[in-house]
Amino acid sequence: MPSATSHSGSGSKSSGPPPPSGSSGNEAGAGAAAPASQHPMTGTGAVQTEAMKQILGVIDKKLRNLEKKKGKLDDYQERMNKGERLNQDQLDAVSKYQEVTNNLEFAKELQRSFMALSQDIQKTIKKTARREQLMREEAEQKRLKTVLELQYVLDKLGDDEVRTDLKQGLNGVPILSEEELSLLDEFYKLADPERDMSLRLNEQYEHASIHLWDLLEGKEKPVCGTTYKALKEIVERVFQSNYFDSTHNHQNGLCEEEEAASAPTVEDQAAEAEPEPVEEYTEQNEVESTEYVNRQFMAETQFSSGEKEQVDDWTVETVEVVNSLQQQPQAASPSVPEPHSLTPVAQADPLVRRQRVQDLMAQMQGPYNFIQDSMLDFENQTLDPAIVSAQPMNPAQNMDIPQLVCPPVHSESRLAQPNQVSVQPEATQVPLVSSTSEGYTASQPLYQPSHATDQRPQKEPIDQIQATISLNTDQTTASSSLPAASQPQVFQAGTSKPLHSSGINVNAAPFQSMQTVFNMNAPVPPVNEPETLKQQNQYQASYNQSFSSQPHQVEQTELQQEQLQTVVGTYHGSQDQPHQVTGNHQQPPQQNTGFPRSNQPYYNSRGVSRGGSRGARGLMNGYRGPANGFRGGYDGYRPSFSTNTPNSGYTQSQFSAPRDYSGYQRDGYQQNFKRGSGQSGPRGAPRGRGGPPRPNRGMPQMNTQQVN
């Protein structure tokens, strides 16, 4: 038996199962609850926490004992199932196995219940502690507010008006008596003492804080011949009277009235100072506008604000000049003169300034409309409106070709007269004389195409016209030419003829009234022939107006090598030998030709076909359309000058006969545009708009003279 008991005891120790998870969890929960309950609390909270902790400890110990006992019984039961014999004590213990199991379950349930109760108690304790903390803070804030109010009341009691009001009270009922005011004055000395240098600041105000604390607590301690409780009642009566609340409102009202009274004063001052900036702004605008207009036409030093009447007249005139400049048509590449060339120096006399403005207007408004009319609507086969509206002139009178740049050099000079064509009734010659004035150099290299086929007899003296153009090397200008950058866009003329001689002779032939307009921006086709420009030593002195070919013969101008500069390159011309371009290619090319093909891309049909009659333009342009005469015969062609067109000055009858183009070979009308041999197709025809050869505007200088 003893051995069995010892064996069972050893077996229970060795084979006993570990404690269940529930018991260990409860122990851990109890252990965790114990530190949580150690929150520093006073009163019942701490007691409850400690009691709950002890209860949980007892339950945990009982639970561990029941688990051990159950483990031993499990070992006995296992041995008995194996067939081992147990002693009587072991058998009695095995018979109580069910009771031990029930007790263990009850202990676990009780532990769980106490754990939940402990958690609830902890939460309740925390909430209670938080609530008590808030109550204490509210009480402390209330005490602090009371202290601040007490200090304010004690400070205001030093004012005589406040003391009088408190004595009189509201509605005749006094709030404080003289004795109560005296008590408060004495307590004020204790609560807010004067600085005593013999004591530290902390010690001095520690005594003052004790007096305030006792007053707030309402203690029965004696102070100033009375008690703190009595003083507290006096102070509370003052707070309840709301006297200081009404006093504050009254003071705020006075401040508002003062601010309201000062506001209108500031507004009046602002209203008085407001008109001055407006007047200054208006005057400033007027001065700026006047200076802006006068800055273009008169010196700033000559401007005077006192001469208002003269300034107005000058402004009106300058505005008119500006408008006229805007209305004038712009050429293909108009040149922009320098600002000082259009700005004459204003004289002191207003009449002189007005005369200068009129001169400038006359110069700007000269024949510019003539250029515009010649450039527009060139497909129309009727007369040019500019020719119809031209002024009649004598046969010996000169025709002025417009000038693109006309800066007034002399105060007496008007528009310079470039390219004057003189017309004579018998054996007349139509030379394009490029006259140069001061400050201008002409650039007009011209062709002299000739065609000797199908010449008709000359019926009238006016038909005997020879168009010769030669370079006058003797009429070179003494003034310097313009910069090279502006020369391709400037057509400049020289020796001036009589003023205002810009009329056109309506009795002259169409060639005599040709429009000498120079299109610099025209497209340039490539040069395909080596014999582009040929030279001829003798001039053909006949001009046939039958329009069967290129009848008029224009002598080539002698070009000065040092002054002929184009957009593409420098023209190296010969000063001794004139140049002539023939339509039939009958003249052999010469070695010393002055027109290199690579440097003359602008010598094209567009420079030749301009300036002729309207009918000649449609005749010579092979790119107009299918009915332009180059697709079929020319027998049915009729010129535009065959009939007397209304409102036109051309009444010549020598053009009424039909033209014969049968003998005209169009394979090389101009050498620059020989695309191929043969008469069919527009590729052998020039691209120009018809007419006699005209100069390229890209050449910087040219002087022409009449050749006998």
Curated annotation (Swiss-Prot):
Keywords (A to Z) from UniProt: Acetylation, ATP-binding, Cell projection, Coiled coil, Cytoplasm, Differentiation, Glycoprotein, Methylation, Nucleotide-binding, Phosphoprotein, Protein synthesis inhibitor, RNA-binding
One MF term in GO for this entry?
Answer: molecular condensate scaffold activity
Compositional bias (Polar residues) = 415-452, 572-603, 640-656
Q: Which GO terms describe its cellular component?
A: cell leading edge; cytoplasm; cytoplasmic stress granule; cytosol; dendrite; intracellular membraneless organelle; lamellipodium; P-body
- Carrying Phosphotyrosine, the residues are Y623, Y634, Y637, Y650, Y661, Y664, Y669
Q: Where is the composition biased (Acidic residues)?
A: 269-287
Its GO biological process annotations read: generation of neurons; intracellular mRNA localization; membraneless organelle assembly; negative regulation of translation; positive regulation of dendrite morphogenesis; positive regulation of dendritic spine morphogenesis; positive regulation of stress granule assembly; regulation of deadenylation-dependent decapping of nuclear-transcribed mRNA
- Low complexity composition-biased segments: 1-15, 22-37, 475-489, 535-559, 675-685, 696-708
N-acetylproline sites (modified residues): P2
Query: Residues where Omega-N-methylarginine occurs?
Result: R163, R624, R631, R638, R697
Any idea which residues bear Asymmetric dimethylarginine here?
A: R697
What the entry says about domains is: The C-terminal disordered region undergoes liquid-liquid phase separation (LLPS) for the formation of a membraneless compartment that concentrates mRNAs with associated regulatory factors. CAPRIN1 molecules in the condensed phase are neutral. mRNA-binding promotes phase separation. Moderate concentrations of ATP enhance phase separation by reducing the electrostatic potential of CAPRIN1, thereby promoting intermolecular interactions.
This chain's function reads: mRNA-binding protein that acts as a regulator of mRNAs transport, translation and/or stability, and which is involved in neurogenesis, synaptic plasticity in neurons and cell proliferation and migration in multiple cell types. Plays an essential role in cytoplasmic stress granule formation. Acts as an mRNA regulator by mediating formation of some phase-separated membraneless compartment: undergoes liquid-liquid phase separation upon binding to target mRNAs, leading to assemble mRNAs into cytoplasmic ribonucleoprotein granules that concentrate mRNAs with associated regulatory factors.
Protein name per the record:
Caprin-1
Provenance organism: Bos taurus (Bovine)
Classification from the root reads: Eukaryota, Metazoa, Chordata, Craniata, Vertebrata
Q: Which gene encodes it?
A: CAPRIN1
